Amino acid sequence: MTDKCIICGFKDKNKLFMLCSNLKLMGDHFPDSPSIMTECPNCGLIYVDMDATQENFNRYYTSPNSNPFGYYEIYGEEHTNNYFNDILNKFEDKITNDSYILDHAGGSGDFVKFLQTNGYKNSEMLEISEKCIEIADKKGVKSVEGDGTKIITSLEKKYDLITMIHSLEHFMDIDKVIESAKNMLKDDGYLYIEVPDAEKYSNTDSVPYTMYTFEHIYHFTLDTMDNLGAAYGLEVVDKGQFFKAESYDVLYALYKKSEKSKTKYTSSCKDAVLNYKNTSANRLKPFIDNFEKTQEKLILWGIGASTALLMNGTFDRCNVLQLIDRNKQRQGLKYSISNKDYIVQDPDDIKDNNATIVVLPYWYHDSIMKQIKEMGFKNPVKSLMG
């Protein structure tokens, strides 16, 4: 477990609620131990406290089982281009077509390709996943290989702008990530950080608890973005909120190098995550009440990073038959529902054609529905998306 707050260094912590009892759903190399949503009582940072390390997450993101997604395939061309234009507008007046730009944890390279197409020819990305680098290379995107937490001494230049677009919240060692970025940034350069907006979690039109995905280790509000800058010597030049690609609310902060300053306590993030927990439970209630009443046999499909919280009592009074996930590294994991142990199984292990399949995830909903159809299941299918 974490021994101190990574922002302010405070050693005490407030445990808010358990996310999951078994971190091994992230992979065999993760510890068989719980993860707890936690608040720093000194600065108000909200983080997931667990026994995992940055190396565990590095292995997770470089695993052969990882599925790099492209913005265009998820959101479509129109929504993606509008979203990328929204991002570009946040710092367009700070750069030129000759500026050196690095997209931190750039994934499959979609944003860098967008920048190149719009005239920013000196754009490249930092990425740890060889699979992502291969995909980006086919798009003509240049990559710097690295995990984002180490100082890269081989770089021949520094950057005018570094972007972290939905990457910072995925790192345990955000202190090392920020210091590495500052080292790669010119003294008069800018750092753009964009993360999910915790204050708007309850507005998210998706499966309840989706924003508590285990891949998101830290949760942020505009106030905690101020503290992030204060702790690591970054001055906030601009910050704000907007809606990402017709999907969910995000916030951003544009920083430049400065001196470290004192953090201030804010309850905004704690209030937001607790409100989202209550909102999610209330949204689920009619759905779960019906299952409890009918006692129809249920096959729960999609036991992963964004759905494990649903295993914490949600289905305890329902007639659960099986837990299913197609990810091999999750098969064999054990969960207890109403004091009965269940093992996550392969879709091929489904034998009861009358049981109702309940699709749990938001992120992989469409691919699961497609797989159910392709495998020829005749079961009734319901989704937590409604």
State where each predicted segment sits:
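Hydrophobic, well-ordered beta-alpha structural blocks that scaffold small-molecule cofactor pockets
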Residues: 250-386
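Conserved S-adenosyl-L-methionine
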Residues: 14-20, 234-245
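Conserved N-terminal segment of class I S-adenosyl-L-methionine
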Residues: 1-165, 175-178, 250-254, 258-294, ...
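Short aromatic-enriched loop/helix-cap "lid" or pocket-rim segments at secondary-structure transitions
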Residues: 18-20, 202-207, 250-252, 334-336
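Conserved SAM-binding loop
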Residues: 85-207, 211-232, 255, 309, ...
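Class I S-adenosyl-L-methionine
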Residues: 217, 226-231, 246, 259-270
